[in-house]
Amino acid sequence: MNLELFIAEKIHFSKEGDREVTPPAVRIAMIGIALGLAVMILSVAIVIGFKKEVRNKVIGFGSHIQISNSDAARSFETRPIAVTDSMLAALADNSGVKHVQRYSTKPGMIKTSDAFQGMVLKGIGPEYGSSFFRRHLIEGEFPQFSDSASTNRVVISKAIADKLKLKLGDKIDTYYIQDDVRARRLTIVGIYQTNFSEYDNLFLLTDLCLVNRLNKWHPDQVSGVELELYDYDKLEETTYRIADEVGRHPDPYG
């Protein structure tokens, strides 16, 4: 007879009439195993849910694919790339690409009467998909930003607003250093909160035109292009296809 089966039968059945009797120790062990499995399943579900939430927030701030200069991996102070209408159309026509949008960045500093905060001013145009920030907007509005005019409106995070004691409608003085120190006064029209501190403590959103002027760039130059995909699982193959497409559009500025 199989040894394991023999031991199991001895534990499971009593000597009196082969009645099924589950000793308390066995019952407790079974309950413990069931609880342990439940905790493991719950833990895995929480980890998967947290991972998905973090991924969605990263994508919300920067989309699935970013096309930019190679120095963008080291700094938000980047050299521009030229993005023509034909290039945008070609990227948008690529299978798997849901949406295409331009952006420009400029590192700077916010200064109030008694505090200061480093930040990155992100300029976006009218085509920017704002659904992510609208979902996380807690005060004010998320306006349609412009690529042809500077409205001096800005959307900031609650984390920065709380740290600098700012509120909706306040005007903030921002400073940027390149060849010289440049200043811009911006009006807070919206406050967002994603609870993703790595980004909430960093990004302000404003007109693409304003950031391009601070960078002294041509109207068709930007820090990069963000691409939203239909299917995250096809990210790798779409990235290779997009790389081939970008290679067909040389930068006229070198």
Residue spans for each PLM region:
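Alpha-helical transmembrane segments
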Residues: 36-47
